[in-house]
Regions:
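Bacterial signal peptide processing site
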Residues: 36-39
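C-terminal motif of bacterial Sec signal peptides marking the signal peptidase cleavage site
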Residues: 30-34
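Bacterial N-terminal signal peptides that target proteins for export
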Residues: 5-21
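Extracellular beta-rich repeat passengers
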Residues: 42-110, 114-121, 139-149, 156, ...
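Hydrophobic helical h-region of N-terminal Sec-dependent signal peptides
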Residues: 21-28
């Protein structure tokens, strides 16, 4: 099969047969692997249609339990649930503002001040060793941007994570103290022409994301904490904790915590990147936000909400997923495939919840989805399905919501529909219960996990003894 594909050919698949064929080609063609290079000036095989993600894919660990963890706590050692109390050294070297134009490795013995917008140029790799601390400057809205073709290698360990945090003193830190991290790749999106400009006020010349390489590699983020990011550059043009623009599946995202983001914790604008072991605490806006044709896979992800942090200018949801703001059926369609997610709050027993908190899940503007084996407890409202194209994907089977557990503070809004193929909330509820989703009371929710409601201290998201979520996951 060596002559089946040259490095300069582009595969453009139009139907299910070809999607299957491409999987064979990618697995069995030595020409594809032999010509894979990191440098932009070397031709690479480009695949511009992703094989549709499924729960049966090898990416997913086929665990028996629902929710983000069983009896083993994968947050131990590298996370922090009290970031405002963490003592970090004074900064010893300034990074930025400007463009990094040559490969660079930081020094873990130094504490860096990230100043202004720092861009990792195309063809350049920024390497951050385990244990490095980088503190973001608020006045300059410090933000690290990896442009298309650039790479960030930030690989900590379970006992020595990399930390991006505020430059303010202990006790003085708050949501949105600095910008965040932005990765821009060459994978697909549904913007006109397949190229978008990332939001957040970054230099327009550096803001492009998108292309045709679904396997594009923007680097590695592993055992990384991002604390107090998420600044509003201008209204409705914010920087999130971790922003991902058309990032490809060659990128590694694993063991990443975003704490106290002033906007979304994680937001995807197109792309095909997969991720495991993500955790968000105490953010203001949406926890997980999908847009513009994102079609990657997620497993073992956690979001814990505070009752008091919410988006004053809009609404705060656990999941918020849109296909496109202008053309709801534009392709590629937004279609995250998610298993083993846990979202807790904002409602905790006895709490008063900010009025801007809304849904556990908001699916709208033509978004598709596969959501399975997950736990949502303490949301103000439950599942909100909006718009004809969104509902139609559930009824025609191209979307799926199955085997999830929901506990909602307002029982009258467990299920919400508007302008879609489910004429009433009862019809959507029938779909959900038929597919193994359950709605439970607050007392039952409290028996699922060990100590999930703990705020400003270390919670325990493992399954409680005798938990109803210990079995029942299906892939």
């Amino acid at each position: 099969m060596n002559n089946l594909l040259s490095c300069k050919q582009t595969i453009k698949m139009k139907n299910k047969f070809n999607l299957s064929l491409i999987a064979v080609l990618m697995a069995g063609t030595s020409a594809l692997t032999s010509c894979s290079k990191d440098n932009d000036d070397v031709e690479e095989p480009i695949v511009d249609v992703a094989v549709e993600a499924k729960l049966s894919d090898s990416f997913f660990d086929k665990v028996a339990y629902k929710g983000a963890m069983g009896t083993v706590d994968w947050t131990t050692g590298w996370t922090s649930f009290t970031p405002n109390a963490n003592v970090y050294g004074a900064t010893t070297e300034t990074l930025g503002p400007g463009i990094i134009t040559a490969n660079r490795t930081l020094d873990a013995s130094k504490v860096y001040l990230l100043s202004g917008f720092v861009y990792v140029a195309s063809g350049v790799t920024l390497t951050i060793p385990a244990g490095t601390v980088i503190r973001g400057d608020q006045a300059s809205k410090a933000t690290l941007v990896v442009v298309r073709g650039g790479k960030l290698i930030a690989e900590g360990t379970a006992t020595n994570p990399i930390v991006f945090t505020s430059n303010k003193a202990v006790g003085q830190r708050g949501n949105g103290d600095w910008g965040g991290i932005i990765l821009l790749g060459k994978s697909t999106n549904n913007n006109p022409g397949g190229v978008g400009k990332i939001e957040g006020g970054i230099d327009a010349a550096q803001a492009d994301h998108g292309g045709k390489d679904v396997a594009d590699n923007s680097g590695i983020l592993k055992y990384v904490r991002i604390e107090f990011p998420g600044i509003a550059y201008v209204q409705d043009n914010e920087i999130n904790g971790l922003t991902l623009g058309s990032v490809g599946s060659g990128t590694t995202l694993d063991y990443i915590q975003v704490s106290n983001s002033g906007d979304d914790s994680f937001e995807w604008f197109g792309g095909t990147v997969n991720a495991k072991h993500l955790i968000s605490i105490n953010n203001v806006d949406d926890i997980f936000d999908f847009d513009n044709g994102f079609s990657g896979r997620l497993q073992f992800v956690i979001g814990q909400r505070s009752p008091v942090f919410a988006d004053a200018a809009g609404q705060s949801n656990g999941i918020e997923s849109d296909n496109s703001n202008t053309e709801f059926s534009s392709t590629p369609r937004t279609r995250p495939v998610i298993s083993n997610m846990t979202i807790i709050g904002p409602s905790t027993p006895g709490s008063v919840v900010d009025v801007k908190h809304q849904n556990a899940n908001l699916w709208r503007k033509g978004s598709k989805m596969v959501l399975a084996n997950s736990i949502f407890i303490g949301a103000k409202w439950g599942i909100d399905i909006r718009d004809v194209e969104t509902g139609a994907a559930l009824t025609d089977g191209t979307s799926l919501i199955k085997n999830n557990i929901y506990q909602v503070a307002d029982a009258t809004k467990e299920v919400i529909v508007s302008n879609n193929s489910f004429a009433t909330a009862d019809l959507l509820r029938t779909y959900l219960t038929t597919n193994g989703n359950t709605f439970i009371a607050e007392a039952a929710a409290g028996a699922l996990l060990t100590t999930p409601y703990t705020l400003i201290a270390t919670p325990n998201f493992t399954l409680a003894t005798g938990s109803a979520a210990a079995t029942g996951a299906t892939f």
